């Protein structure tokens, strides 16, 4: 019976992956897809590593207690403690993800370079993750104080925190393993989806084993798995835009399609236009992927799983749109390259 459910889960994973693999303009070699999938299976190790650290050494970093300073302390004091704790969590996840990627690739030099490049750009992602949670908790505190309404900030905050961790770890895996294999934007989407599917695959197996209910594989293959692939695909699209920030900003700025704020924003920050664009897209991808994942998880917690169906349909339509946009960007950039 267990083999039956495992076969169904494997088949669902393959079908979901094949659907989006065939949407690629220039599909990646099967070997690259296989390595990405194995890397996705191992993304649970950084999550387990984080849990091991807070269980045995730093209990204040758990998904519940890490939010306590925002709820119980004065504004600035709570914000300071929370940001410090989040910095520790991000560091733990990055270290475990880096070690996992290095072991998988047998300490390949390319992986070391990918990790080095990611560490250079990690501060904006850390600020984005921390700010999302802080704004959520403070908004709920404000509503509680002004409207005298009791809000389950802990539940919502914990769900968002866990969604952030999962999306961030999956994203790190793509950057550490596949960064230099990305030749166009749709590569980033596909490789992110593959990692997301692998994460969902191993998560479902662990969940089924822990609960002793293998039948849970069926609804998770139809509902939870697409949630993961959509969230990963969203992040992958924006990461793809960030990856090609230099040619994209050059094309858009020259054709006067670029957004007005970059005419002064990059000057204020003393950053190149392409660097500002890159950081913005990474942050945008993280926010959108996390919000999508969080909304879906809240619906599951409230036993409103049926509402996730239209959410999944909308998400799949968005991923299809992202592929079309990535193909347009590919043609635009290659056309400009030929004209040079």
Model-derived regions, located:
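Hydrophobic alpha-helical segments at protein termini of multi-pass membrane proteins
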Residues: 1-340
């Amino acid at each position: 019976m267990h083999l039956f459910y495992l076969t169904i889960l494997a088949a669902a994973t393959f079908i979901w992956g094949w659907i989006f693999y065939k949407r690629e303009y220039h599909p990646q070699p099967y070997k690259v897809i296989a390595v990405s999938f194995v890397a996705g299976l191992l993304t649970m190790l950084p999550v387990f590593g984080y849990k091991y650290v807070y269980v045995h050494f730093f209990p204040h970093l758990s998904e519940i207690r890490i939010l306590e300073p925002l709820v119980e302390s004065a504004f600035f004091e709570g914000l300071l403690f929370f940001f410090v704790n989040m910095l520790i969590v991000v560091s733990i996840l990055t270290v475990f993800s880096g070690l996992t990627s290095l072991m998988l690739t047998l300490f390949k030099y390319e992986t070391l370079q990918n990790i080095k490049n990611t560490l250079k750009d990690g501060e904006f992602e850390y600020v984005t993750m921390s700010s999302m949670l802080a704004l959520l908790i403070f908004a709920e505190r404000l509503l509680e104080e002004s409207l005298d309404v009791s809000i389950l900030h802990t539940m919502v905050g914990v769900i968002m925190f866990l969604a952030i961790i999962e999306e961030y770890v999956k994203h790190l895996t793509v950057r550490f393993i596949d960064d230099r294999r990305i030749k166009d934007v749709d590569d980033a989407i596909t490789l992110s989806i593959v990692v997301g599917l692998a994460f969902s695959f191993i998560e479902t197996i662990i969940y089924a084993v822990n609960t002793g209910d293998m039948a849970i594989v069926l609804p998770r293959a139809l509902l939870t798995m697409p949630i993961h692939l959509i969230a990963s695909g969203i992040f992958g699209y924006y990461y793809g835009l960030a990856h090609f920030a230099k040619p994209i900003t050059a094309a858009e700025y020259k054709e006067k399609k670029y957004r007005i704020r970059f005419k002064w924003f990059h000057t204020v920050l003393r950053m190149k236009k392409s660097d500002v664009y890159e950081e913005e897209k990474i942050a945008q991808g993280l926010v959108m992927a996390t919000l999508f994942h969080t909304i879906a998880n809240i619906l599951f917690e409230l036993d409103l799983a049926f509402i996730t169906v239209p959410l999944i349909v909308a998400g799949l339509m968005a991923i299809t749109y992202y592929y079309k946009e990535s193909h347009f960007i590919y043609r635009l950039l290659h056309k400009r390259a030929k004209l040079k």
